[in-house]
Amino acid sequence: MSNTDYAALNKRFAIPGQLDFAPGPGGLAVAEVNNAHASAMIALQGAHVMTWAPRKQPPVIWLSKAAKFAPGKSIRGGVPICWPWFGPHATEAKFPGHGFARTVMWEVVKTETLRDGATRLTFRIVQDDATRAQWPHASEAYNIVTSGRALDIELATRNTGSAAITIGDAFHTYFEVADIRRCTIHGLGNCPYLDKVDGGKKKQQTGPVTIDGEVDRIYLDSTADVLIDDPGLNRRIRVSKRG
């Protein structure tokens, strides 16, 4: 983006002492959040939360040191958005896995400071002929990011047409831990899951999840909070979900 673009973004959406817009890694446009509770960096490409750290604490969101930052390329780490489908496309093998939302630009439509001092940004996906060729449905996607005592991310789709549509979406979040082999994950006990390392077989979780090798699973019908117990960083990360 040009300096004029940043000037316009900051004039309309910056919050003094909390939020501004600037070139980030690889020249990607980013929103930089620094408030009394936490710091965060969000790329406008993909409305992608790249980093989030509570004040005076290690990062909670992991960003790979080998991440590539380039227009149209997915960023390894952070919180990539999967939209409007999850996994491979149902009929078109040439379409990107997990959709295109994480590699296209999103526009800022609103910023605000909440009563507790948290910072909230609302992004809307920018669609063009290329995205409409893959997703020819009248719809809008919004990503609402709130950085405060907790990180809250809300993905919403609005059907702007008259026909019903079916979407798949997810946050493909990467969490920062000291040593994954020492971590335990609570809250998924008795949940069925698909084990993609074992050919997609359906299995059931017994007790906490531990990781000592390759793990690739899709847990089904999980509504409880999930706790990542990390003794190396002496903390627990709570993952809550709604919707």
Named regions from a protein language model:
Residues 1-76, 224-225, 230-243:
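Beta-strand-rich N-terminal accessory domains
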Residues 25, 95-147:
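Extended, loop-rich substrate-binding clefts of extracytoplasmic carbohydrate-active enzymes
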Residues 25-27, 36, 100-105, 137-139, ...:
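Residues that act as N-cap/strand-start positions at coil-to-secondary-structure junctions
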Residues 31, 40, 121-123, 141-143, ...:
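Hydrophobic residues positioned within well-ordered beta-strands of beta-sheet architectures
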Residues 42, 155-161:
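Asparagine-centered strand-capping/turn motif at beta-strand->loop junctions
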Residues 60-114, 123-124:
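Extended, compositionally biased flexible segments
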Residues 127-129, 145-149, 159-161, 173-177:
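Beta-strand elements of well-folded, non-transmembrane domains
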Residues 164-166, 170-243:
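Active-site/ligand-binding surface loops and adjacent short beta/alpha elements
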